[in-house]
């Protein structure tokens, strides 16, 4: 592909679409980031940045955060709603609430809060879904509007802490997930002398589509049915506390790809709001929950990895539906709240790491089978002769199916001793050579060739062994088949020489990325430029800022990676700050209740028993360094 261009690379990885202008490919084929979206002309090369970090002692893999992207996402979302409110003459305001479950890292939460620090009236609050999250939020919310929303199941301690938050000056909304929570809230509020701010999570009949659709619908784990909502109203009236019901909440699920689902959910919840107001409730806030999606594959579609709407359309739909409904039922317009954590955080973080080795199929010369070889082998040789153009052509699809069938039968005969090891090896080599020739002969412009091309790409793909743990750094890729954009960080000015799959360094066959963004679709392999030990390149995993860190596990005892915060200063200089060391071997041993100190004593006993005296000090030093070392491979330089 001598006419390969940078535009071809951008289209191949679809980077201009999934990145929303935050990441790109430079004219010299290097992946770049615009760390401050307000200055898109200021770009940083990720490849050189990673190499500089390594030189300064930060080993790969490293998770890099760009806090100015967080600021931009917060302000963009607030601006979209502010403009929609003005457009539809909505008679209230908008509040963005960050659910810290999406990414509880202190750096992330503080940077999100800092994005509104210069606003006269901050449009930002925090959400907690558990006691530990609430304890964090109580301390951090003072830097925002001091609005706190408490979701999740609650015991007496959780409820008391939330009420204490009210005494501390916060506006704490306790959202009732179960009807039994109401009694505890009222009892503890009376004991503490606090007037509670109550919210209701309603269980909608409508259920959105997607991987998290179980968050909504009549069988949802959370929320109150219509009958239970009426029970709450009755109980509050009896206690003369109906004015305490200030918030209505619903949640369709994370990553809602279709704007119609969002519109329909808001419409049904809006009817709940109007009915509650008719019953005398004092609902001031309408909380649409999460659902604002991230376009992971850049296709702007209804795929579970994508979204068929933009930020403006999202805000316009919510505001317009509520405007029309409140006017129709002559009800006041409530403050609109959204809990859009995935949208805020996904783009701000990228994992950078090295390839430690590759395994690729290289065509080898093959000889015809012996005359007395089984007929199956002669059949396979005939397929090779025909596909290589040395005999009359048959349909390429027929050759493929025949050769695959013959190889399957060879394997069966080997299992029962009718074919030897050398014959099996020969058959496998012929099959690979046939597949290799077919891959170059078939064309995607023929629809009936496409499924076989996909199968051949997967069968002949290079294996890239990458220095990371899928289970630690991209758990959703393993757990729910989530797609994350993956790109080589350099060499993209050259045409791809092969297709590859990315394998992690865990001892688990599931540690493989199975889906890749490729053009306007998803493929099982990734186009890559040539990689050699003499001319290696790094790999970037993008849009990993939401959920991945907190969901990551320590399979094979691979721990947290190193991380760093990178910021662009006023003079457009790159500042690497807040470098946080990843887990050491001793750290992860402690997590599973293994005592590194006692291990060291055991090593000393073994060294004294088995190692010559002049070697003991060096061996002990290596063992000690092993405990202090990074859990990932450290050979890259």
Swiss-Prot record:
Query: Which reaction(s) does its UniProt entry say it catalyses?
Result: L-arginine + H(+) = agmatine + CO2
Specify which residues bind substrate according to the UniProt entry for this protein.
286-296
User: Per the UniProt record, which EC number(s) apply here?
Assistant: 4.1.1.19
From the UniProt record, which GO molecular function terms apply? arginine decarboxylase activity; metal ion binding
The record's Gene3D superfamilies line, in alphabetical order, gives: 1.10.287.3440, 1.20.58.930, Alanine racemase (3.20.20.10), Lyase, Ornithine Decarboxylase, Chain A, domain 1 (2.40.37.10)
* Signal peptide location: none
Keywords for this protein: Decarboxylase, Lyase, Magnesium, Metal-binding, Polyamine biosynthesis, Pyridoxal phosphate, Spermidine biosynthesis
List the cofactors.
Mg(2+); pyridoxal 5'-phosphate
- Would I find ATP-binding among this entry's keywords? no
> What is the uppermost EC class here?
lyase
The source's superkingdom equals: Bacteria
The record, for PANTHER family, names:
ARGININE DECARBOXYLASE (PTHR43295), BIOSYNTHETIC ARGININE DECARBOXYLASE (PTHR43295:SF9)
The text of the family note is: Belongs to the Orn/Lys/Arg decarboxylase class-II family. SpeA subfamily.
Q: What does this protein do?
A: Catalyzes the biosynthesis of agmatine from arginine.
Q: What is this protein called?
A: Biosynthetic arginine decarboxylase
**Which organism encodes this protein?**
Shewanella halifaxensis (strain HAW-EB4)
Taxonomic lineage from the root? Bacteria, Pseudomonadati, Pseudomonadota, Gammaproteobacteria, Alteromonadales
